[in-house]
Amino acid sequence: RVIPNQNPIQTLTLQHGNNTNEATLAWTNSGTKTGANFILQELLASAWTTGGELFVGRGLFKFDLSAIPANATIISARLSLYSTPNPLNGNQVDANFGTNNSMFIERVVSNWNTTLNWPNQPLGDIATQISIPHTNQSTFDLIDVDVTGLTTSMVTGNNYGFKIRLQNEVFYNLRNFCSSKHANTAKRPKLVISYQ
């Protein structure tokens, strides 16, 4: 007699549309722009200029993990971010640009909401950050990045989401990804989690 697996591996695919837990942070060295944009079609990890001053962009986004039982074991978690085909920032041609656009994906370690701005932005966990190397390709999607450790911490602890930022925020460098507001639903941020 074959005994069925009482605890089979399950897969959850999350690709939210119009995610309210998502924002691009902006900072300029004059302090004139230090807020967060919650409706932008892009998630930025960038260092550029605007009006002759330095502009730095960072992205924050959170997936709803409530469907995963708190006592579940995370087998794997893969994050995909897709380069925007129609950039609204940077040189408005290349989604990836610069001589050093290497970036970090980090687990956010404190809560944030619509009062978010640059001065009160939550920190990312640098001890577990994931390093993404530089690319010379104008369009380069990040497919199935292993975020198992980060996601496990979100399920077993607090889920404050992910942060993306350049490793060196020096202009002109850019990584520009589609947000959950992008018209192409297939290019919105995606997280695929296997658990049991």
Question: What is the meaning of each model-derived region?
Answer:
Residues 70-75, 152-160:
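Short glycine/proline/serine/threonine-rich loop/turn segments at secondary-structure transition edges
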